[in-house]
Amino acid sequence: TNTPEQDRYLQVKKYLEYVVVDNNMYRNYGNAGPCVMSAEISFEPLQEFSSCDIQEPLSQDIVQPAVCGNYYVEVGGECDCGSPKPCRSACCNAATCKLQREHQCDSGECCEKKDDCDLPEICTGRSAKCSCVISQGDLGYGMVEPGTKCTDGMVCSNEQCVDVQTAAK
């Protein structure tokens, strides 16, 4: 039986095999070492690419047709935030995997909140950069001024929430 790491390795290896598959997948390409598409499974890493590994790849996606809702932006898609229920993107239409009207992007630093000192940001859809909601003094991209209360007994200091006593030192 395999360890979890070996199982994961085999899953990734199998995926990569599909990426490089072509019409000559099991043809003998000489003594350059094992081919990625070899029928034998090996845990030994390849030292170099053999000629079979660098043949002209497929000119199209392996998955036909593209799948919307798998969190992977495929050919023809512009975004993919999963199926409609778990999708939390205001910029991506989960049903079509196309950007909402007037939007040009769906991801970037403005989508992730670091802590309570990081004000809510708005994905404008025009850039992956933040466009923050300014409710108090702003130091850039959603960061508030030092001393601003962020939770009970906590204030912002150096862009992080710290205990009031710690900030006073």
Swiss-Prot record:
Family: Belongs to the venom metalloproteinase (M12B) family. P-III subfamily. P-IIIa sub-subfamily.
Note: Negative results: does not have an affect on factor X (F10) and fibrinogen.
The enzyme's E.C. designation: 3.4.24.-
Control of this protein's activity: Inhibited by EDTA, but not by PMSF.
Annotated localization: Secreted
Role noted for this protein: Snake venom zinc metalloproteinase that calcium-independently catalyzes the conversion of prothrombin (F2) to alpha-thrombin through the formation of a thrombin intermediate.
Keywords: Blood coagulation cascade activating toxin, Disulfide bond, Hemostasis impairing toxin, Hydrolase, Metal-binding, Metalloprotease, Protease, Prothrombin activator, Secreted, Toxin, Zinc
Annotated GO MF terms: metal ion binding; metalloendopeptidase activity; peptidase activator activity; toxin activity
Entries under InterPro entries matching the protein: Disintegrin_dom (IPR001762), Disintegrin_dom_sf (IPR036436)
A GO CC annotation given for this chain: host extracellular space
Residue ranges occupied by any Peptidase M12B domain in the UniProt entry: 14-57
Positions occupied by motif D/ECD-tripeptide: 116-118
Cofactor(s) the protein requires to work: Zn(2+)
Protein name stated in the entry: Zinc metalloproteinase-disintegrin-like mikarin
Tissue expression pattern: Expressed by the venom gland.
Cofactor note: Binds 1 zinc ion per subunit.
Record domain Disintegrin: where: 65-129
Paired cysteines (S-S): 68-97, 79-92, 81-87, 105-111, 110-123, 150-161
Subunit structure, as described in the record: Monomer.
Transcription among keywords: no
GO terms classed as biological process: proteolysis; venom-mediated blood coagulation
SUPFAM superfamilies: Blood coagulation inhibitor (disintegrin) (SSF57552), Metalloproteases ('zincins'), catalytic domain (SSF55486)
Entries under PANTHER family matching the protein: ADAM A DISINTEGRIN AND METALLOPROTEASE DOMAIN (PTHR11905), DISINTEGRIN AND METALLOPROTEINASE DOMAIN-CONTAINING PROTEIN 28 (PTHR11905:SF32)
